[in-house]
């Protein structure tokens, strides 16, 4: 998505324009290098790494309150995002373009500490409207502004709620998984789907959590699938 590639492209391109359909909320990425002292502690007592991992996990779990729309936690998340914007973008005009006009959580909150700085570079221009059409080498925004381009990069994110593979999978009644989910995505533990025997899905419905690591979810789903396959093998079950 653009949040990932814009900072890298900004370092390479002589000039770049970023088309923005709507401003996202961003929170800082809290990555840092471990100090030499911390590394020595981990080496002497490996259990400290497990404790740190547990602390990070439960810190992430506290963010679930934001997802449940608990007012105090929603307000704290919004304040964090807007403070991050204010700290990284000094130009008030650019900051206004990057300020969302909707409540936090209406679309996925993004995590980056280098996206805003990329947009403040002299060789980067923010077009605060969508790309409407392309005529030859000219990109035209929804507001009618025209930009001559050498390269057009489409970076509109991921189809998290409409997985492309669903069109290729058909169940017992011949209906595709995509059509089955047309009125809403449902699945048992986000893994198995009624009417689609022997189908196991990783990262199925409602597993795209925004408050913690999805790796934990994947590991739990893999355990479920392995247990199901072991049960089928042990009891000679052909269809699950």
Task: Name the predicted role of every residue range.
Residues 1-90, 124-125, 147, 176, ...:
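Rossmann-like dinucleotide-binding core of oxidoreductases
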Residues 68-77, 102-114:
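Short beta-strand to alpha-helix junction loop
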Residues 119, 153, 199, 222:
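Hydrophobic, well-ordered secondary-structure elements that form the walls
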Residues 87-100:
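Short, surface-exposed acidic
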Residues 101-103, 118, 122-142:
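A conserved short coil-to-beta-strand element within the FAD-binding core of flavoproteins
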Residues 142-151, 155:
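Core beta-strand elements of the Rossmann-like FAD/NAD(P) dinucleotide-binding domain
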Residues 111-116, 169-200:
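FAD-binding beta-loop-beta segment adjacent to the flavin cofactor pocket
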Residues 2-5, 154-172:
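Flavin (primarily FAD) binding-site architecture
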């Amino acid at each position: 998505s653009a949040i990932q590639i814009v900072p890298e492209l900004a370092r390479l391109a002589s000039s770049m324009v970023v088309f923005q359909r709507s401003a996202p909320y961003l929170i800082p990425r809290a990555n840092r290098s471990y100090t030499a002292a911390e590394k020595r502690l981990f080496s002497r007592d490996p259990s400290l790494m497990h404790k740190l991992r547990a602390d990070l996990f439960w810190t992430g779990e506290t963010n679930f309150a934001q997802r449940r729309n608990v007012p105090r936690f929603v307000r704290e998340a919004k304040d964090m995002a807007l403070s991050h914007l204010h700290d990284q973008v000094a130009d008030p005009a650019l900051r206004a373009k990057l300020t969302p006009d909707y409540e936090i959580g209406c679309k996925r909150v993004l995590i980056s500490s280098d996206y805003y700085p990329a947009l403040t570079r002299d060789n980067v221009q923010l077009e605060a409207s969508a790309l409407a059409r392309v005529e030859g080498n000219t990109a035209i925004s929804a507001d009618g502004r025209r930009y001559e381009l050498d390269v057009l990069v489409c970076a509109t994110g991921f189809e998290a709620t409409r997985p492309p593979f669903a069109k290729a999978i058909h169940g017992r009644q011949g209906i595709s998984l995509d059509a089955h989910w047309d009125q809403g995505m449902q699945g048992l533990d986000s893994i198995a789907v009624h009417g689609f025997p022997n189908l196991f899905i990783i990262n199925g419905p409602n597993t795209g959590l925004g408050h913690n690591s999805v790796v934990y979810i994947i590991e739990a789903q893999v355990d479920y699938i392995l247990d199901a396959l072991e049960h089928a093998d042990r009891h000679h079950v052909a269809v699950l």
